[in-house]
Regions:
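Carbohydrate-active catalytic/glycan-binding domains of CAZyme proteins
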Residues: 1-543
Length: 543
């Protein structure tokens, strides 16, 4: 076997590192391996943990929130749930600090620990005195510090926040000692100084923070101090990373919420969130990007010579032939379409519940039985749905309703509602839906601003209805294709023949229309009478 040649510095990686909804990245390193975690909001399992040995190729190795006893998100509002985690490693133990927002059960800031970043992770240690959101942990010798952001008690302007710091006692699981106010941001009038991270480099302690809100005005600023408690002096060049001055036609926008890591060769790198709008619409949510960092005059400089997040960049110098071979992936991503068959082993995500709570056996790895709980996907309820992130501006998601199911516990009048959806929230979605009650019908449904409308509808023939009611194979084919981030083409059919089709504007799935903090998710679902459902087969995501 021929050896993989060492990469030359002319080879490039392509941003984003993690496509689709992967916001608020936080990164750390243990030995030769980097670990990265993202926000997941109302989706479970929560807080995906990725690993990499070269900062370019990332593998999903687990999730931090995997058990109902860790956290109950069943009541989470749209774009509520798990906000802005921080991952750190200290003396062989991994920590994640996070905040649960907009839920009826235990909420607020907490931390969890694990001996391995792959898990299992502990139950949360809640910190009721840790006000606000976006916590971070910083280790300085024997001291463990907890920082977060909150609204200023007497703000000078709307949206003014402050970064605060306090010692953490991990034995007692509580904050202790005096509280220190570190910073209110670099620019007066800029909202939401948030997402703080602390570092020690050379003689200084550094505070990195986002500000401007996680939209068009998003930015990264930095301050430094001689002591971790301050006082902090802002960089005269703040903000040190932003695309807000590039205008609305920029390919990469909303840059912010960065975290830094040092590689084994001494080089520094940043991960940050950003968006890739198409036709002024953001469907994919906020994604994870990479940039090199240099130090000049004791200040970090992001992507020296350019000062912005690159769409591509040089492969890190510490990447060796061995790490390239171990990744088993090309350094340059192929532009050719990729077809991904989805089955039980897919890392599905579910809003307000765990996928395993809904997923049943169906005879093979590429078939899934999905029974309704009675909850609906167009309400903030823990409905039976299995989703994957929409990660490309041109992509397709398809599934076949192979046959209907009825639980022995289901009785009385029943309605079966099963299908596929592209959803940004319960109030913003497009669905291709099979409805079976007194007749069998296929609907194409659009939900915009919480208002549902049936775009197209077609009754199926009596023979198909009889097969469906009897639980016999029916082969109802459902497909949605996003076309260049502008249009969603919906097609439904049987035996390869199209029964219904419609082209709908994709705007309903965008952040610009729906608001919130998440990206679009493609799902199979069941939301009829509790105990009814379907076996889904031929589930595919392709781009």
């Amino acid at each position: 076997m021929s050896k993989v040649p060492a990469p030359e510095q002319s080879l490039t990686f392509t941003n984003p590192l993690l496509e689709g909804m992967h916001p608020d990245p936080s990164i750390c390193r243990q030995g030769d391996t980097f670990y990265l975690v993202n926000s997941t909001f109302e989706y479970l399992p929560g807080l995906p943990v990725y690993a990499s040995t070269n900062l370019v190729h990332w593998d999903l190795i687990g999730h931090a929130i995997t058990r109902p006893e860790q956290l109950d998100l069943s009541s989470a509002r749209a774009s509520g749930g798990l906000f802005a985690p921080t991952i750190r490693e200290h003396n062989g133990l991994f920590y994640i600090a996070c905040t649960a927002v907009g839920v009826d059960g235990p909420s607020g800031s907490f931390y969890i620990t694990a001996a391995s970043a792959a898990g299992p992770w502990s139950n949360p240690v809640w910190l009721p005195d840790a006000a606000g959101i976006d916590p971070t942990i910083f280790f300085d010798g024997d001291d463990i510090w907890w920082a977060g952001c909150r609204q200023v008690a007497e703000p000078e302007y709307e949206g003014q926040t402050e970064i605060w710091l306090q010692r953490l006692d991990p034995v007692e699981g509580r904050l202790t000692g005096p509280e220190h106010i570190l910073w209110t941001g670099a620019v007066k009038g800029a909202i939401w100084a948030e997402g703080p991270h602390l570092y020690k480099h050379g003689e200084y302690f550094y505070l990195l923070a986002a500000e401007g809100g996680t939209g068009d005005n998003h930015a990264v600023s930095v301050a430094r101090a001689n002591h971790v408690t301050g006082p902090y002096l802002g960089n005269p060049r703040n903000p040190v990373l932003t695309h807000r001055n590039f205008g609305g036609t920029a390919a990469v926008q909303c840059v912010g919420h960065a975290d830094l890591v040092q590689a084994t060769d001494g080089s520094w790198w940043a991960v940050a969130l950003a968006t890739r709008p198409r036709h002024s619409l953001t469907l994919l949510g906020r994604e994870t990007f990479l940039a090199p960092v240099a130090w000049e005059n004791d200040w970090p400089v992001f992507n020296p010579g350019l000062g912005c997040l690159p769409e591509s960049g040089k492969v890190p110098a510490f990447v060796t032939a061995e790490t390239v071979a171990a990744a088993e992936q090309p350094l340059i991503t192929s532009p050719n379409p990729v077809r991904r068959v989805l089955g039980r082993d897919e890392p599905w995500i579910t809003a307000r519940g765990f996928p395993a709570q809904h997923m049943g056996e169906a005879g093979s790895e590429n078939r899934i039985a999905l029974l309704s709980t009675g909850a609906r996907v167009d309400r903030t309820e823990p409905a039976a749905a299995l989703g994957v992130r929409l990660s490309h501006h041109t992509a397709a998601f398809a599934a076949t309703v192979e046959r209907l199911l009825r639980s022995p516990a289901a009785g009385g009048p029943m309605q079966t509602l099963v299908g596929i959806s592209l959803s940004q929230s319960p109030e913003s979605q497009i669905r291709a839906e099979l409805s079976v009650e007194k007749a069998a019908r296929i609907d194409i449904v659009e939900v915009a601003g919480g208002v549902s409308r049936i775009v197209e509808s077609r009754n199926l023939d009596d023979e198909t209805f009889d097969r469906l009611v009897a639980g016999e194979p029916a082969g109802i084919e459902l497909r949605m294709a996003v076309l260049d981030g502008a249009t969603v083409r919906v097609e439904t059919g049987t035996d390869g023949a199209v029964v219904l089709s419609a082209d709908l504007p994709a705007r309903v799935l965008s952040t610009e229309a729906a608001g919130g903090f998440v990206g679009a998710v493609a799902s199979v679902y069941s939301m009829g009478t509790a105990g009814t459902g379907a076996v889904f087969a031929e589930m595919v995501y392709e781009h």
